[in-house]
Amino acid sequence: MKIQHVLTAASLVALSGLAQAQVDPLHVRSWAASCAACHGTDGRAQPGMISLAGVPKEVTIQKMLDYKAGRVPAATIMHQLAKGYSDEQIVAMAGYFAAQKK
């Protein structure tokens, strides 16, 4: 089962350039802005919260897919939020946050 998760993430990363090229950057910024309440503006969180800025795209993609699929214990609302995004949106947002300075 773990291999399937890795293959899924690898496939999404491979397609990420294509996905980002097809997604309007303003849409990506808008989706990413919805993360600001918890993760800070452009992913730079306050102490005590997880920062997304500068996190490798592959890491964020895998984590979001894990939340979306219910593979992460429901300690936060992330499992519900992740279900609201398509895989392509997740890839685009992961690329956005990876490009932000820590």
Region spans (language model):
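Bacterial N-terminal signal peptides that target proteins for export
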Residues: 1-8
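Gly/Gly-Pro-rich "capping" loops immediately C-terminal to redox-active cysteine motifs
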Residues: 28, 42-71, 80-85
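The canonical Cys-X-X-Cys-His
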Residues: 33-41, 93
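C-terminal capping alpha-helices of c-type cytochrome domains
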Residues: 83-102
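Electrostatic cytochrome c docking/interface patches
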Residues: 13-32, 48-50, 66, 101
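Inter-heme linker and motif-flanking segments adjacent to c-type heme-binding CXXCH motifs
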Residues: 44, 73, 100-102
